[in-house]
Amino acid sequence: MIRIINGQTYFTSKYPNIIIPEKPIPHLILKHIRYKPDQVLLVDGLTFKEYSSHFVADTIEKVACGLNKLNIKKGDVLGVILPNLPEYVPIFHGTLLMGGITSLVNPDYTIEELSHTLATVSPRYLAVTLAVYEKIKNDLKRVFPSVEKVILVDIAGQTLKEIDQLTLSSDGIVMSFNQLTNNNGKDYPIVRIDLTKDTAIIPFSSGTTGLFKGVCLSHYNLVSNTYQTQTIETSTYKKNDSVIGVLPFFHSFGLMLHIMLMVKQGYRIVTLPKFEPVRFLELIKKYKVAMSFIVPPIAIMFAKSPIVDKFDLSSLRTLFCGAAPLGSEIEDLIKERFKGRLVIKQGYGATELSPCCFVTPNGLVKSGSSGTLLPNLLAKIISSETGENLGMGEKGEICIKGPNVMLGYYNNEKATNEVIDKDGFLKTGDIGYVDEDGYFFIIDRSKELIKCKGFQVPPAELEALLLSHPKVADACVVGLSKGDMGEVPRGFVVIKQNESLTEKELLDWAHPKIANYKHFRGGIFFIPAIPKSATGKLLRKNLKDFNNLKL
């Protein structure tokens, strides 16, 4: 697990390297799902409509055929502005089958956010719901001058009649998904793909630390990470297991796990466009869901919400948490609540890594760890001050090298060179360490560390402390400038419903548990909700206005 190269320390996977198939991802998907043509592959969590593997495979090819009729060319971009719907699967893979590029964004984005993300990659086509179209139609030509066709996808609560009326009154720019797929699925060419050089998708970096950047991922990036993760993650699944697709498909974490890995493996995926606690728990009960990929806010629900006790969740065996670190306190609360029968696993990565690099292995689960290195990867941990490689147990910035590292940022060579070093290692910007068993632990983002009196204070550590208070529902910690001290921690807390708590009570409880330099000298503010991204990452930058308050 430790390799010394030219006197420098590197970390290798405990797993042997695997062979990465040299085929585009849609070819592999079609091959695998046609093995079990009659098996239910997708379920619409709103309508309960079921889709067989055979139907999904046929629809992928019908999307390819429909796009061919629209004269799609290799490298053309189809912007996907959709929630989690069954149609996401054929739209995604059908576009890639034609050599097109899918660019994925949050359907809740405003026009301004769309202009800073999707519009920058000049999409030729858009796939949207009626609600999204209503939001963008008046600004379509201004924000998306490159768009030639908008494909409307039906969602529960909208009628096909409404969509058909729009297609007739939109100067020919709008067509329905049904119109796109109204063909035999056979009339499309075989497009030659350069696996390592051709971009397959352009998701956008989270924007939690700055402006959005388009991340160019190749077919080989996607295939590599699907097979790397499969090596560890699917070995305990059973033949007819169901998973619930609540993680946003527009995010690389939800996309790879559901649209690629779970589809390829043939597990039944119940799609849910938006996380609603009651519906989410009802679907777990109804479809006997065995596995759920979640983010920390959902984990907090499993740990603390009384609503969980109202549902039969006996089918649930595993929770896999990613997108942001999950503190050991919340993990332990879930285990205690479910009397140890639930396996809590974590994964770690970044959009730039397609996205996974660590996954909790089967067997020994270490509370608070993000897991061990996936196959075919090399890691190093570097000092944020000297840039030198560090050893086991030493804390520094985690850097990853392997076949899942992105091609680069879209039209941004400068930003690419800032995060990928001369040896091909991606600098994650996250601070962590590796223990003697090869388990990695994430402490915090290097840019978010609070530097107080010469000490580095990880906000995540203080957030975990606040979350362990029985009356606290959610929490976020940021750094606040204060003269000679540098920065001091300031806390933001959401109190549990029907509970009361004062700042003094919370400070008196917290301060004896932490070193003096970690004390909340910036105070604690009680707010209605903690700002988070769609994938559950804390948006500390959104609390900037509070930081402008004078101490």
Swiss-Prot record:
Keywords: ATP-binding, Ligase, Magnesium, Nucleotide-binding, Phenylpropanoid metabolism
UniProt-annotated stretches for the region SBD1: 276-346
Binding residues annotated for (E)-4-coumaroyl-AMP, in chain numbering: 253, 323, 346-347, 351, 447, 451
Pfam families for this protein: AMP-binding (PF00501), AMP-binding_C (PF13193)
This protein's record includes keyword Lipid metabolism: no
Catalytic activity: (E)-4-coumarate + ATP + CoA = (E)-4-coumaroyl-CoA + AMP + diphosphate; (E)-4-coumarate + ATP + H(+) = (E)-4-coumaroyl-AMP + diphosphate; (E)-4-coumaroyl-AMP + CoA = (E)-4-coumaroyl-CoA + AMP + H(+)
Superkingdom, natural source: Eukaryota
Known pathway: Phytoalexin biosynthesis; 3,4',5-trihydroxystilbene biosynthesis; 3,4',5-trihydroxystilbene from trans-4-coumarate: step 1/2
Top-tier EC class: ligase
ATP-binding keyword on record: yes
A single BP term in Gene Ontology: phenylpropanoid metabolic process
Positions of CoA binding: 274, 453-454
UniProt-annotated binding residues for ATP: 205-209, 213, 346-347, 351, 430, 445, 537
Record-level Gene Ontology MF annotations: 4-coumarate-CoA ligase activity; ATP binding; CoA-ligase activity
SBD2, as annotated region: 347-409
EC number per UniProt: 6.2.1.12
Requisite cofactors: Mg(2+)
Domain remark in the UniProt entry: Both substrate-binding domains (SBD1 and SBD2) are involved in the substrate recognition, and are sufficient to confer the substrate specificity.
Physiological role: Carboxylate--CoA ligase that may use 4-coumarate as substrate. Follows a two-step reaction mechanism, wherein the carboxylate substrate first undergoes adenylation by ATP, followed by a thioesterification in the presence of CoA to yield the final CoA thioester.
PANTHER family with a match to the protein in the record: AMP-BINDING DOMAIN-CONTAINING PROTEIN-RELATED, LONG-CHAIN-FATTY-ACID--COA LIGASE
Family: Belongs to the ATP-dependent AMP-binding enzyme family.
Protein name per Swiss-Prot or TrEMBL: Probable 4-coumarate--CoA ligase 3
Naturally occurring in which organism (per UniProt): Dictyostelium discoideum
Gene field: 4cl3
